Amino acid sequence: MSVRNIFADESHDIYTVRTHADGPDGELPLTAEMLINRPSGDLFGMTMNAGMGWSPDELDRDGILLLSTLGGLRGADGKPVALALHQGHYELDIQMKAAAEVIKANHALPYAVYVSDPCDGRTQGTTGMFDSLPYRNDASMVMRRLIRSLPDAKAVIGVASCDKGLPATMMALAAQHNIATVLVPGGATLPAKDGEDNGKVQTIGARFANGELSLQDARRAGCKACASSGGGCQFLGTAGTSQVVAEGLGLAIPHSALAPSGEPVWREIARASARAALNLSQKGITTREILTDKAIENAMTVHAAFGGSTNLLLHIPAIAHQAGCHIPTVDDWIRINKRVPRLVSVLPNGPVYHPTVNAFMAGGVPEVMLHLRSLGLLHEDVMTVTGSTLKENLDWWEHSERRQRFKQLLLDQEQINADEVIMSPQQAKARGLTSTITFPVGNIAPEGSVIKSTAIDPSMIDEQGIYYHKGVAKVYLSEKSAIYDIKHDKIKAGDILVIIGVGPSGTGMEETYQVTSALKHLSYGKHVSLITDARFSGVSTGACIGHVGPEALAGGPIGKLRTGDLIEIKIDCRELHGEVNFLGTRSDEQLPSQEEATAILNARPSHQDLLPDPELPDDTRLWAMLQAVSGGTWTGCIYDVNKIGAALRDFMNKN
């Protein structure tokens, strides 16, 4: 195409052009003291605010910063002018506007800035997944820089929904120790009537390839799953869990997580959150007073009670780090998961696969917290963004009209009793719900690993609560090669899949949801286990062991496994103990002792083809090095400036 063609459709209107304008009427509310003592940036900021059309006489009011992961471009009719990367951030402008209107009505000055986010669902199985986890640190850093760019802000309100943008936003808010901050969860997308949820629909390719879904059904299911244009996915994945954790931290107002996006209650949550931020600012209650060690432990407790995503093992420590709190250790997670029962029955864990909006209607986080309070598992004296303690919030919730009316709506509209979604501890135990997370160790994972043990298919667990699988390994150096074999009928019941080289150094610690989701929804999948140094989507279920340490590219034993090796997996889902061990090879006439097997594995070289993915971006390579120096996955893949600085100084001194 020539330059002439590019400009071929010019309108003659372009030649009607102004080169001057009158400028805003009125005067800035300046005083002699302001002109003498305030920096020029403050004064010029007022000039620009007037230029954008704000009433000049209102410009010396307290600034409240709205920070969002908004994406896409909505027309006046709500239809897309430009598509977003996911529906989770597509409607956030509605919540932003609702909050801004409250701020203005209360004689403060709202500002809005944006750092949009990617979609883990969109990037599954693509090189885009190499940027997924690293994005979180980068986005949080940009958000913190934006917040500091309005240095006189009296409060910051974060509005976010999904897998990486929401943790990044919470990290950014957690770092604002000396001002008020509030998180507005972006809610959940509505489930489709007679449609599949957003987790199951991501398996249409694998099910079609295995003859378990017709082409026509795949087309229909793929079109229908997202029944509304906003909110995070309908399951308790990383997005939904992060919303729940925000409430558990006291960083979001009560009963705000998992609200149905676009509905009146969802808008009101934004308005109420703005009122909360203004109240905190007026009372002088800062983030440092809300995000404490006790608040972090409450969030971990709520995570366990909901059966949350294993990705929060990466995000909660990162939030704690930014808040200046104790970073939870594996021992902390084990301690909490051993004492906290899972109480919530939603996708993907079950036993009944309710969409997360049903958990909101059943009372959401405060309802779960009432049960946890009855067990003495919460720190009720913590301060929250309401300006009241958690105890005061729960006392209000227990007797609120809101609680009763939403439960009744769930019964009237869906014929579902709220107690079937959020169970009492006694009912949960009777239904066979187990605690959420187990950390297996063994000669394959000497530094540990993670499994969402509560999500293993119950039919695969014996009467003592034990999942046991001894089988032959099939080793893959990429998720792509594993999913190829799944789609081409090369995986059979009883296999143990091992995907190596997909930890932080290999692929940015990508999610392997293509594999885990296929195993969940294929008829033979419950008889297949997975071991990997990658991580999992929050919607993953089954006998899937991830976060294996050390990772293969750091010389970990997992990188020394070969196809044909015999592996034993044992998970005690009640006592939360687990082992994952190399036993020998399929050709061994007599298996070696455990000690001998460990020595054999350790003596092997790593797989000869083990390398970082050739398409791994330099940005992600840098992230992998920085987070490794800072403590790695068990400290949340954070950037610890002191540790990074010490490592650089040590390197320079040696060279």
From Swiss-Prot:
Similarity comment: Belongs to the IlvD/Edd family.
pH effect summary: Optimum pH is 8.0.
Keyword Lyase: yes
Taxonomic lineage from the root: Bacteria, Pseudomonadati, Pseudomonadota, Gammaproteobacteria, Enterobacterales
PROSITE patterns per record: ILVD_EDD_1, ILVD_EDD_2
A GO BP entry: aldonic acid catabolic process
A Pfam family hit: ILV_EDD_C
GO-annotated cellular components: cytosol
EC class (word): lyase
Function: Catalyzes the dehydration of D-xylonic acid to form 2-dehydro-3-deoxy-D-pentonate.
Domain of life: Bacteria
Name recorded for this polypeptide: D-xylonate dehydratase YjhG
